[in-house]
């Protein structure tokens, strides 16, 4: 049995294409892996604070020197990191906001990309500590950006995940969703075809 960690980052609950892709992915995954445990963290319902001085203090100060706010910030980071460490499969669902990922997802990444926990520095440079995990990234985009200089989602997420040792990453993009005509239908159909191949 494997554990699947799903991170939802769309601000929308209704009408969200990235959430629609997540539902499609999970339906297929559960059918193929009925005994797997699914853990869902919804960053719209439970926002993760952006990196702040309390979290930095929690990471760097000895426990006896931490304020209550720093202890609370560290406990939150430990909880989020623990979910990632305990997962075999990571699913990131992210609409494209202004060419990149939602700030809520960036905040989550800031909590879990941690020196000494998910990566370490060595004399040969940084080394990811989460090798062996698999990741799927489900994106929803109003235009068509894959492979273009305007796509700051896929390059950043590949870099961030690779930095912590997750190199087996599949991207499923639903593109052209706001372009009118049959672009939305075709974009969704292509994304679902890709999901059927990888999930």
UniProtKB/Swiss-Prot annotation:
EC number(s) reported in the record: 1.6.5.-, 1.7.1.17
EC class of the enzyme, as a word: oxidoreductase
Cysteines engaged in disulfide bonds, as pairs: none
Catalytic activity from the UniProt record: 2 a quinone + NADH + H(+) = 2 a 1,4-benzosemiquinone + NAD(+); N,N-dimethyl-1,4-phenylenediamine + anthranilate + 2 NAD(+) = 2-(4-dimethylaminophenyl)diazenylbenzoate + 2 NADH + 2 H(+)
Cofactor(s) required for function per UniProt: FMN
Molecular function GO labels: electron transfer activity; FMN binding; oxidoreductase activity, acting on NAD(P)H as acceptor; oxidoreductase activity, acting on NAD(P)H, quinone or similar compound as acceptor
Keywords, alphabetical: Flavoprotein, FMN, NAD, Oxidoreductase
Coiled coil segments of this chain: none
Pfam families: Flavodoxin_2
Keyword NAD part of the UniProt annotation: yes
Binding site for FMN: 10, 16-18, 96-99
Cofactor, free-text remark: Binds 1 FMN per subunit.
Function: Quinone reductase that provides resistance to thiol-specific stress caused by electrophilic quinones.
Family named by the database record: Belongs to the azoreductase type 1 family.
Quaternary data: Homodimer.
Protein name per Swiss-Prot or TrEMBL: FMN-dependent NADH:quinone oxidoreductase
């Amino acid at each position: 049995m494997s554990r699947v960690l799903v991170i939802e980052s769309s601000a929308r609950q209704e009408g969200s294409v990235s959430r629609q892709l997540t539902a499609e992915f999970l339906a297929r995954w559960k059918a193929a892996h009925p005994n797997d445990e699914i853990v869902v963290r919804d960053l719209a319902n439970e926002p993760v604070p952006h990196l702040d001085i309390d979290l930095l203090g929690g990471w760097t100060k000895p426990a006896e020197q931490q304020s209550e706010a720093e202890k609370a910030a560290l406990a939150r980071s430990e909880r989020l990191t623990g979910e990632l460490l305990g997962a075999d499969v990571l699913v990131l669902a992210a609409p494209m906001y202004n060419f990149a990922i939602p700030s809520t997802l960036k905040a989550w990444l800031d909590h879990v990309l941690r020196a000494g926990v998910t990566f370490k520095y060595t004399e040969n440079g940084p080394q990811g500590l989460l090798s062996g995990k698999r990741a799927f990234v489900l994106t929803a985009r109003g235009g068509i950006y894959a492979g273009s200089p305007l796509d700051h989602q896929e390059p950043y997420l590949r870099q961030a995940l690779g930095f912590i040792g997750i190199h087996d990453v599949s991207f499923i993009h639903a593109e052209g969703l706001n372009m009118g005509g049959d672009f939305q239908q075709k974009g969704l159909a292509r994304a679902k075809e890709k999901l059927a191949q990888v999930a």
